[in-house]
Amino acid sequence: MTNSVRKVAAAAATAVLGAALAGCGGGAGAPDAGREARMGTPAASASASTSTSASAAGAPAASPQAGAPAKPPTMAPGPNGLTPVFERAKQRTDKTVALTFDADMTSDQGPRAADGEHFDNPALISTLRTLKVPSTIFMTGRWAEEYPDQAKSIGTDPNFEIANHSYSHHAFTSPCYGLPALDGAAARADVDRAFAAFKQAGAVNTVPYFRFPGGCYDDQALRALSTAKVTAVQWDVVSGDAFAKDPVAVAEQVLDGVKPGSVVVMHCTRSAAPVTEEAVRRIVPELRKRGYRFVKVSELIGK
């Protein structure tokens, strides 16, 4: 197995994406962004994708809460017990697609929020509800602490499920677009701290899925999270919504990339992804016109 870092952007886009990913999360930018990261460690991804488990048994106490509607499906560990990686449904005949949204906020952005910067996007959540689009929100623990009422509202709405995007939005391997890096023990604790923040906010619909900040990971990162009993979730469609100014371009990029079983990465952060809500209003009706049904990640993993 290789221990090389999988990045979220093609090499040509790295310089442009650095600033976006440092403050926003994986998947922004060029149409090919994310291709290398999504591959993960080949053996871990390939093996885990062929074996699923219908239980999150063994998850730590701070992990997905009792009271969620049902136990969400998880993937079996990869070789040597590595955390499994999911990026697209194995069942690719059904025209299903999962829109996922990273609710990003780093551990040091509190002062910026206090000064009026908006890391939330209530209009986006409202639009998803109005359009009746089941969605998975990959939330940082720091975001849940900053916006506890919104975290609770999202996390008690059956239209949504909340997945873990770390507490701090620090990198789980280095280099990763300038993000501060956590070592193995700190990385594992960071995941638990995020689940605890969701619970503190009153979110119930939490699921044992994890998205690496910046989308960057390697074997060591997968090993560090193995005891958390989570499934790492990447994507196969990059929206390019981070710091985008043209919602039409974002929508076209998504529409061009979606295939049956796709996972689309977008963002739920006004300051870093200001046109996402408008793009969603274009994406949803067009995909429905093409015969697609929107589902949460848990449904894709369960197929």
Predicted regions span which residues?
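Active-site beta->alpha N-cap acidic-glycine motif
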Residues: 67-163, 168-174, 178-179, 196-200, ...
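His/Asp/Glu-enriched short active-site or ligand-binding loop at hydrolase and phosphoryl-transfer sites
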Residues: 217, 221-257, 292-301
